[in-house]
Amino acid sequence: MTKIAWITDSMANFSQEEAARLGVDIVPIQLIVDGNGYSETNLSLEDLHRYMIDQKKEAKTSQPIFGDFIGRYERLKEEGYDCAIAVHCSNGLSSTAKNSKAAAEAADFKVYTIDSHAALEAQQELVRIGKAAEEEGKSVEEIVALLEAWRDKKNFFMIIGNMETMRRGGRVSSGEMFLANILNIKPIITLDETGKVIPFKKARSLKKAYAEMVGELERRHADNGVKDNRVFVQTALSPKMQDDFVALIESKLPGLEVVRTRFCPSIAVHAGFETVGVLWLDA
């Protein structure tokens, strides 16, 4: 029987306990704050907020350290693993998957690299689906094909409540932010089929933005269903936004289970802290 190792990165947002239970090795995304490097798994949202908002420090993300990747794959080879399946965040968000593949080649270790076309719970779900398939005795090739099919079932939408972080990161201009603030515009973003961030809609208030996202959830639920009847609602540090959005989902779609989660720090670096998102897989 093939001995398979499982790898993912910290943008999957696994808790340490869940990763340990599943037997998944987490490679951390790096955060650079005011020139100092931090492993994403060792920096909380609260600490990041203090640095970025209270202390006005600049922050950005960086892919996992290449040498760490090589070291992990060399260790797995020494431990007798035949191969690894590495489920990584979208190439549209980070170069992690490309570096993972390059590190595997450098370590001369067979790794099946999966670009999840997503992050967060969509990335998590792929790992869980793959682990379940492994337990059923499916071959590596069958597992990889299964994951490549499931990754196209992801749905993700996020409201940007405050554009200041995006302005500081150069993603919007000061003029665009000023106009959005004056008109109370709340941008909604989504991921395209390859996992690249693209605009979805602009709403003229938070209430209208919530309605847009729930309306999209209703339409897609009617067309494609929702895996396990479960949706994930994320925030960074805006519990009131999360509460209001969850209440609307539960009023419109009472048959769905809503799981509240938090964005990982690498998402907050780019999108800010006044955010709420919803994610699910088609059935």
Positions of the model-derived regions?
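Class I S-adenosyl-L-methionine
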Residues: 36-86, 90-106
